[in-house]
C-alpha cells in the first residue's frame, strides 16, 4: 500500500480500520460470548450501517449508477418480504442491514479511489491476529506456559463452556480439541469460538495476499498458511492449498509455461483426492454426520418452496427435521441454508457474481476470487457474516466495473485501481 500523505487518505485509512474491526466484531469472536459481555452483536451492525450512511453524506458520494444499483438491491430484498414467511426483525437486522452497509462502504471507497485501504486494513489485521495466535498457541496451548492466562467461561448456544484466555488476545478452547490417531490434538481457534470461523477469517486474508495484491509478500502468505495448518481444519487447509495452487498456475500462465493438457488432469486428480481426504477425515466424527444431515434438510426444505424458501429465520422448520440433537438451531452449510430459508431468490445475490465472472473480460483475475468465495459459502453458514458480505460487495463492484469498461482490468494495476 502506498504511503498515506493527505488528510483525506488518513481519514479513509482510519475509517477503514474501524469498519474492518466492527465487521469482525459482528462475527463469532470470543469477546461477544464471554461471561459478562455487555455489548450485543447487533450493535456492531447498526454502527456499520451508521458509518456507511455518514460516509455517503460526508464524502458527497452520489454516483448515479452506483446508487441506482444499491437502490435496486434494496428493493429486491424488500420484495422478498411479500412472498415469504419471514421473521422481519431478524431479516432486517442480520441480513438486509449489513448487506446494505457493505455495498455503501465499498462503493464509497472505490468511487474515491481508496478501495485498497479497505483491503490493506483487513489483510493487516489478519496478519496481527495470526501472529498473536501462533505465539500463544505454541507457547501457551502446546508448551503450557500460562502467559497472562485466565480461566473463564463463555456461552455458546446458551450453554456455558470452559476456556482459557491468554491476555484476552487468544483463547484455548478444549471443546474444539480433537483425538487424531489416538492422540489428543489442540486446535488453534485464535479469537473465535470455533475453528471454522477462524479459518474463514484467515482464508479471506489469504485471498487478498494471493490474488488482490499485485506484488506477493511471501512471509505474509507463509504466516497465514502456517496458522491455517494449526486450525487442523481439513476443509480449510485444502481450500488454502487450492488458493496457492491457483495462484501458482496464474504465475505459470503469465510466464507462458502453462501446459493445460497436463495441468487440467492433475488439477482434477487433486480435487478428487481432496474430496476423499475430507470424506475419510470427517466420516469418523460428528462433523461429517452433521453436514450430511444439513445437506438432506436443506435440499428437502428447498424442494418445498424453491423460489422463496420456507422463510428467513424460520428455525422451527429446520429443528423439526434434525436427525439428532445439536448444540445450536442452525445448519452448518451456508448455501443449503440460504436455499432452504431464502430460496433461489436470496441465493441469487451470491450466485450471480460467480456466473458473471465466467464471462467477464478480466475473468483471469476475478474468477479465482469468485470460486474461493463461492466455496466458502458452500461449506460454511456465512450468508449473514458482515466480513463475507463485504467481500461479496467488493466482488459485485469489480464485476460491474469490468462490464462497464470492457477489459478494464487488462494491463492495469489490478490491486490499487479496482479490487
Where in the sequence are the language-model features?
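A membrane-periplasm/extracellular boundary helix in multi-pass inner-membrane enzymes
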Residues: 135-144, 247-287
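Transmembrane signal-anchor hairpin modules in multi-pass inner-membrane enzymes, especially those
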Residues: 1-82, 401-419
Amino acid at each position: 500500500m502506498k504511503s498515506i500523505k493527505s488528510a483525506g487518505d488518513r481519514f479513509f485509512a482510519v475509517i477503514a480500520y474501524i469498519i474492518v474491526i466492527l465487521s469482525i466484531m459482528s462475527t463469532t469472536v470470543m469477546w461477544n460470548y464471554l461471561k459478562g459481555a455487555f455489548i450485543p452483536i447487533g450493535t456492531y451492525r447498526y454502527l456499520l450501517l451508521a458509518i456507511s450512511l455518514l460516509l455517503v453524506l460526508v464524502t458527497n458520494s452520489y454516483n448515479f449508477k452506483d446508487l441506482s444499483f444499491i437502490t435496486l438491491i434494496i428493493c429486491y430484498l424488500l420484495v422478498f418480504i411479500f412472498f415469504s414467511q419471514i421473521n422481519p426483525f431478524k431479516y432486517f437486522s442480520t441480513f438486509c442491514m449489513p448487506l446494505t452497509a457493505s455495498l455503501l462502504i465499498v462503493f464509497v471507497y472505490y468511487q474515491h479511489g481508496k478501495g485498497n485501504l479497505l483491503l490493506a486494513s483487513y489483510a493487516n489485521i489478519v496478519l496481527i491476529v495470526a501472529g498473536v495466535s501462533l505465539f500463544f498457541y505454541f507457547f501457551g496451548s502446546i508448551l503450557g506456559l500460562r502467559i497472562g492466562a485466565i480461566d473463564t467461561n463463555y456461552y455458546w448456544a446458551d450453554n456455558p463452556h470452559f476456556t482459557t484466555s491468554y491476555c484476552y488476545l487468544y483463547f484455548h478452547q478444549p471443546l474444539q480439541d480433537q483425538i487424531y490417531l489416538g492422540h489428543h490434538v489442540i486446535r488453534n481457534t485464535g479469537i473465535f469460538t470455533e475453528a471454522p470461523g477462524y479459518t474463514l477469517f484467515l482464508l479471506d486474508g489469504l485471498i487478498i495476499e494471493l490474488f488482490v495484491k499485485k506484488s506477493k509478500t511471501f512471509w505474509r502468505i507463509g504466516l497465514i498458511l502456517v496458522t491455517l495448518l494449526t486450525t487442523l481444519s481439513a476443509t480449510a487447509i485444502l481450500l488454502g492449498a487450492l488458493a496457492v495452487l491457483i495462484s501458482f498456475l496464474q504465475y505459470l500462465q503469465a510466464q507462458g509455461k502453462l501446459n493445460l493438457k497436463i495441468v487440467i488432469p492433475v488439477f482434477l486428480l487433486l480435487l478428487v483426492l481432496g474430496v476423499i481426504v475430507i470424506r475419510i477425515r470427517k466420516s469418523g466424527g460428528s462433523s461429517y454426520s452433521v453436514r450430511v444431515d444439513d445437506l438432506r434438510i436443506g435440499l428437502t426444505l428447498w424442494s418445498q418452496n424453491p423460489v422463496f424458501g420456507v422463510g428467513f429465520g424460520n428455525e422451527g422448520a429446520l429443528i423439526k427435521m434434525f436427525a439428532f440433537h445439536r448444540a445450536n438451531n442452525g445448519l452448518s452449510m451456508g448455501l443449503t441454508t440460504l436455499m432452504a430459508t431464502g430460496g433461489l431468490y436470496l441465493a441469487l445475490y451470491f450466485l450471480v457474481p460467480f456466473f458473471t465472472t465466467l464471462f467477464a473480460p478480466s475473468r483471469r483475475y476475478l474468477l479465482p476470487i469468485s470460486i474461493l468465495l463461492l466455496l466458502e459459502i458452500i461449506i460454511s453458514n456465512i450468508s449473514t457474516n458482515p466480513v463475507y458480505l463485504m467481500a461479496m460487495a467488493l466482488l459485485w463492484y469489480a464485476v460491474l466495473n469490468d462490464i462497464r469498461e470492457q477489459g478494464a482490468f487488462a494491463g492495469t494495476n489490478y490491486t490499487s485501481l479496482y479490487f
